[in-house]
């Protein structure tokens, strides 16, 4: 809309670590662009390919990524953020959300020690932490795996303010659509 282009002619292809994203693009709640533009059939993403599929495609086409000359591109959303770098790790969504909440409620960036939320990152299938933002103590829980989520849902959840659940061990970085690169030692995660 801002570029004065017909949005129906734009095709959005997302490269994702997760095979579930292929099914998610058809979900009704994931068509905000269509709702905004009153185009019922429009989805936020038209196609999803996994990183594994992208690697396979590059190999099939004989592409050597190291020999490709960098070029300029139209950066619609900017270069990225620190939160974006950790988002695909177990605990990364939680940390990114807490960073944002801190900035909104406190009106400033959190101190460096606030970002050391090591208790919420890593490969344990359940982690908990408490943080203080704007004078309020917040209890958070990070889970991965449906078994851990099922156990959590059977408990009294009333003491928690925010819960993150990811299906894969370690988060999206270990998704089924990622290239096979062996197991990540727990100490390196």
Pin down the residues of each PLM region.
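Iron-sulfur-associated redox domains of electron-transfer enzymes in respiratory
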Residues: 1-189
